[in-house]
């Protein structure tokens, strides 16, 4: 049994991309989950959600998301939390984040690569689960890929990590990035949580729980 806490009564709207098991994990965590279909995205009431999350590569797969992305930015400005899982270069065809940003080729392929938390008092690392060394143990395949690259200074990097071998040198940023916008927040997650969830990696569930709990985090 995993030791993972989640804030109560979190409503998540999920925009399916290429397909991942994160929605199942969110339901296991106790979130109230709806799948956001094209009509919902165009004119449905998004204010009933605490969090809107996009599946992996959703900007490539979902024409409606590209067309109605402004609705996600409005949702964040009004106090919502938007969580965007990794995208490929399709994300760079327009400005889909609240400020200019581009997905780059940044990745960390060693699943045990050391991770440094850059903003330790950020609620994503403290509420309701405390993120520490053990969070990063037992990962599979990689830490993440298609990190956010060039970006407006209003985006804040929350993590840095570094592959321990010479063919991918240097500290990598862009794996977990937040921008505050209006009353809410917009986050980009290049971390491969979608890859860890089927492998039942407890640390990934803790991070996922903290991400969706952000709207209820103590101010």
What are the roles of these predicted feature ranges?
Residues 15, 19, 65, 69, ...:
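Solvent-exposed, acidic/flexible segments
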Residues 57-140:
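A glycine-rich, often tryptophan-bearing local segment used as a flexible ligand/cofactor-contacting loop or short
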């Amino acid at each position: 049994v995993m030791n993972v806490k989640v804030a109560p009564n979190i409503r998540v709207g999920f925009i399916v991309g290429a397909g991942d098991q994160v929605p199942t994990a969110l339901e296991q965590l106790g979130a109230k989950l709806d799948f956001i279909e094209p009509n919902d995205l165009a004119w449905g009431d998004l204010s009933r959600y605490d969090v809107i999350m996009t599946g992996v590569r959703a900007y490539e797969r979902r024409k409606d998301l590209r067309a109605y992305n402004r609705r996600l930015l409005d949702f964040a400005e009004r106090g919502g939390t938007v969580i965007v899982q990794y995208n490929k270069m399709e994300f760079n065809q327009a400005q889909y984040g609240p400020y200019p940003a581009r997905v780059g080729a940044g990745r960390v392929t060693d699943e045990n690569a050391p991770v440094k938390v850059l903003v330790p008092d950020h609620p994503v690392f403290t509420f309701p689960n405390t993120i520490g060394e053990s969070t990063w143990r037992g990962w599979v395949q990689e830490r993440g890929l298609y990190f956010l690259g060039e970006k407006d200074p209003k985006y804040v990097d929350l993590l840095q990590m570094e592959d321990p071998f010479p063919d991918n040198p240097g500290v990598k940023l862009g794996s977990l990035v937040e921008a505050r916008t209006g009353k809410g927040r917009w986050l980009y997650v290049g971390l491969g949580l979608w890859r860890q969830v089927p492998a039942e990696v407890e640390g990934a569930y803790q991070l996922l729980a903290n991400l969706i709990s952000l709207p209820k985090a103590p101010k």
